[in-house]
Amino acid sequence: MKFSAILIAGLLIAAPSAWAQQSPLVLPMIEPGQPMEASPLEPAPEIPDATSADELVPAAPQRQEIEAETTPAPVVVELFTSQGCNSCPPAEAYLGELAKRKDVLALSFHVDYWDYIGWKDRYADPAYTTRQRAYAKTLGDGMVYTPQIIVAGASDAVGSNRGTVDAAIKQAKTRLKMQALKIERDPASGEVSLELPEADLPVPATLWLVTYQYQNQDAIKSGENRGRKLVSFNTVRSLQKVGVWDGRASTLALNLSAQAKANNPDGCAIIANLADYGPVIAAVAFDFDEAW
């Protein structure tokens, strides 16, 4: 189901100057111990030979690295879809296959612009439509449609066109220099943080925090898919802009909104897009329960 009549496929990476000149739509920012000294009246206890002094002092809680569900640098594949589009189920099934791969971070963004034709998609959010339109502007064709897949923020294809998408994934691995990200959790405070490495970036990158559910099934009662049971994989339930990375090594505290938690997500991901909606140069996915 197309919103425009033109389709341009293939990997496209804009020059840094082009990214810097882009003015895409912008989503609103969502937001020990020491041993005691012995008394002068009592001799200090002797430490047995087999015991080190460090063993007598309780260790401070150590930050725990959260194990990522994907490889350090997965290729991000974003499907823009709708329960109101009868062309989307094959693309959803394909995304389910991609979601099983360790070298890919597959996400399903449900858009809202087909809600008017008979069925309101309960996973749709205007923010996801904004993201798709911004990608269209960055890629240069201004076109949005469903099912549309964006690979690594650098190329688009019809979501059910497996050959084109597979080729774009392979190209992304060779043409984009992906950065490894690390998520850590402080057991004492419960704070979740993102460790950003030093990287040579042509322009600053926007950091997006995404939550998603692994699998959903819904009975569609009206619209183009009336009478069908549709399955969606890695269904995005929230999208937050959490910071900007200028290439310097740093640590960023991650705070998830109460609304995002209320959606009972299964997984979380951090995606770094150059200049808001340019190529994805870093990503990491992790289990929601390990962090929050």
Where do the language-model regions lie?
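Sec-dependent N-terminal signal peptides
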Residues: 1-23
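Ligand-binding face of N-terminal immunoglobulin V-set domains in extracellular IgSF glycoproteins
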Residues: 149
